[in-house]
Structure formats: structure tokens, C-alpha cells
């Protein structure tokens, strides 16, 4: 017997309903839901990070010209071994070490101080410390350039003259140029790191401090034996992002010297990449510099995490 049109329509609706129900059940299962929720991040990572990284690696083996692209093998990497790159590497490493020491130790101490009952108006201080991170680096750099200009009327030189010292040409000496970059970076990011440590301090049980007081522990002993162990995870995190940020630094150098610093005293690896890849339009060589920088950051970060015990299990 032939089925009526009405019966056929009902069967089609039932088939679609069953398919929709299976699809709904599939996407709501405990095994699939986590992947559905993180899929936007995965897609954005592939589009914004993974693909550009692969493209940069491919480009580092090429000579990229406006009219043609030629495969040159390791030629771009062989060109990296030059005095200018080693100067940039030395400047970047020095900057990274100084900023890591400052942006880990000082924010930790400030956070402990702000978390105590000694300081009044703690909420006001926390808000004020976060404001530098919201300030444009270009605006902050221009203010710092005025404060540390070469004239005797600059704020920094007036202070030096007031205590009996001579004026300094801040942007024309190696030590003072490094000082400017480190001070600007510390001013920008110290507040955020303080907030990281403050958040971690909220997880320290107050009972431990009370027990330490009963045992007669002083302030220093309570810091090293009670506070510091609970700050280890966030200390590893802050150290890692400070190391990565130190090697990726570009803005602090650019706002002080723009086109180039005298004697390359402010040249960093990213600045060297910008000069060669963008200004000189040598995209292949610039990509090779970027790949080398990525490898340096990866090796140092993994080594630092291993030495600090970040890969060990919690019960070890």
C-alpha cells in the first residue's frame, strides 16, 4: 500500500526529531561539553598564535622580496651571528634580570605590607598601584623623557644638582639608558604584581600565624616559614611572566630612542627584529630573529620552571 502524504511528513518529522535529540545529547554529554566550551579559545589560538608562528618559521627560511619569495635555507640564521645581535641579546638579558629581581621581590614585600594591619587606607593604595598599568606606555614614556631629559632643568638633574652631583645625559649613557628602561617597566607593572601576591596572601590560613605567635616566632620567621611557602605558586607565575616580558620588551626602548639609540645602548632583540624586518623590509631575516627569540624564551622558561619545581606533583 502507498503511504499517504500526511504519514510521510510525520515520519520525516520524527526522523529530524530523533537526530536533533541525539545531537543535543551529544553536545550535553560530560565528555563533549568541556571541549565545546574551550573551542572558542582553541580557534582563536590557532588563528592568532599557531598559524602566525608556523608562517614565521616558514618565512625564516626564505628571502622575501616585494616581487618574489626565494628559499634560502639557513642563510637568514647564519646572518644572526653578528655583533649587533649579540649587543641586543646582552641588553635584553641585562634588562630581563634586573626587572625580574625588582618585579618579584619588591611587589612581594609591598603585598605583605598591604595585607597587614599596619597600613591604613589599604584599598586606596591598591587602587593607586594599579593605575600605572592602565596608562598608555607612549604617554608614560613622554613624561619620563621630560623628567630625565638632558637639560639642567629636568626633574632628575635638578635633584642631582640639589645634592651636589652633576647633570646626567640620561639617554646617551649605557648605564643610565638601562636605568630608564628598568624604571619605566617597574613603574608600569609593579602594581599588577602586587595584586597577584595580595590575592595569594588571602589563601594563607590565619591559624598558622596564630600558631606562630604562640611559638614565639618574629616577623621575619613568620614570613619565611609561613607566608613564603604559600606564595610559591604565584612567585613562579610572576617570575615566568616577568622573564617572558623581559625578553619581549620593545615599548620601553622605543619611547626613549624611537629610530635608534646611540651605540645601540637601548637596542633589544625585538627592537632589532623591528629594525631589520620592518624598517629594512627584510622579512625573512626578521622572522629568523623572531624564531630565535621564541626558542630562547622557551628554553629559559622551561629551565626556570624545572628549577623551581613547578613540574613536581603536589605530594612530592
UniProtKB/Swiss-Prot annotation:
**Where is it localised?**
Cell membrane
| Entry keyword Transmembrane | yes
GO cellular component terms listed in the entry, alphabetical order: plasma membrane
Cited SUPFAM superfamilies: MetI-like (SSF161098)
An example GO biological process term is:
transmembrane transport
Positions of the ABC transmembrane type-1 domain:
89-304
Does the record's keyword annotation contain Disulfide bond?
no
Q: Per UniProt, what is the membrane topology?
A: Multi-pass membrane protein
What Gene3D superfamilies does this protein's entry cite?
Answer: MetI-like
What InterPro entries does the database record attribute to this sequence? Answer: MetI-like (IPR000515), MetI-like_sf (IPR035906), UgpAE/MalFG_permease (IPR050809)
The regions listed as transmembrane in this protein's record are: 32-52, 94-114, 128-148, 178-198, 224-244, 254-274, 283-303
This protein's UniProt keywords: Cell membrane, Membrane, Sugar transport, Transmembrane, Transmembrane helix, Transport
Similarity remark: Belongs to the binding-protein-dependent transport system permease family. MalFG subfamily.
Q: What does this protein do?
A: Part of the ABC transporter complex AraNPQ involved in the uptake of arabinooligosaccharides. Responsible for the translocation of the substrate across the membrane.
Its quaternary structure? The complex is composed of two ATP-binding proteins (MsmX), two transmembrane proteins (AraP and AraQ) and a solute-binding protein (AraN).
Q: What is this protein called?
A: Arabinooligosaccharides transport system permease protein AraP
Amino acid at each position: 500500500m502507498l503511504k499517504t502524504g500526511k504519514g510521510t511528513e510525520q515520519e520525516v518529522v520524527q526522523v529530524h526529531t530523533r537526530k536533533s535529540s541525539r545531537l543535543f545529547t551529544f553536545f550535553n554529554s560530560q565528555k563533549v561539553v568541556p571541549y565545546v566550551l574551550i573551542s572558542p579559545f582553541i580557534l582563536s589560538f590557532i588563528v592568532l598564535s599557531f598559524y602566525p608562528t608556523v608562517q614565521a618559521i616558514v618565512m625564516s627560511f626564505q628571502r622575501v622580496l616585494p616581487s618574489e619569495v626565494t628559499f634560502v635555507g639557513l642563510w637568514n640564521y647564519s646572518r644572526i651571528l653578528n655583533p649587533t645581535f649579540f649587543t641586543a641579546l646582552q641588553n635584553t638579558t641585562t634588562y630581563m634580570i634586573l626587572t625580574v629581581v625588582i618585579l618579584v621581590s619588591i611587589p612581594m614585600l609591598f603585598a605583605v605590607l598591604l595585607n597587614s594591619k599596619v597600613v591604613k587606607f589599604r584599598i586606596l593604595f591598591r587602587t593607586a598601584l594599579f593605575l600605572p598599568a592602565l596608562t598608555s606606555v607612549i604617554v608614560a614614556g613622554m613624561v619620563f623623557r621630560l623628567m630625565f631629559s638632558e637639560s639642567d632643568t629636568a626633574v632628575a638633574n635638578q635633584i642631582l644638582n640639589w645634592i651636589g652631583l652633576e647633570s646626567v645625559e640620561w639617554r646617551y649613557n649605557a648605564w643610565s639608558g638601562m636605568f630608564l628602561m628598568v624604571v619605566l617597566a617597574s613603574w608600569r607593572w609593579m602594581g599588577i604584581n602586587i595584586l597577584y601576591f595580595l590575592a595569594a596572601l588571602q589563601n594563607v590560613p590565619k591559624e598558622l600565624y596564630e600558631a606562630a605567635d604562640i611559638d614565639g616566632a618574629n616577623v621575619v620567621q613568620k614570613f619565611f616559614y609561613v607566608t613564603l611557602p604559600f606564595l610559591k605558586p604565584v612567585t613562579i607565575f610572576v617570575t615566568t611572566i616577568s622573564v617572558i616580558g623581559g625578553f619581549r620588551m620593545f615599548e620601553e626602548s622605543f619611547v626613549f630612542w624611537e629610530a635608534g639609540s646611540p651605540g645601540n645602548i637601548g637596542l633589544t632583540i625585538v627592537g632589532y627584529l623591528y629594525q631589520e624586518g620592518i624598517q629594512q623590509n627584510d622579512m625573512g631575516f626578521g622572522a629568523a630573529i623572531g624564531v630565535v627569540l621564541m626558542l630562547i624564551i622557551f628554553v629559559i622558561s622551561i629551565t626556570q620552571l624545572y628549577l623551581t619545581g613547578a613540574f613536581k606533583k603536589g605530594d612530592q
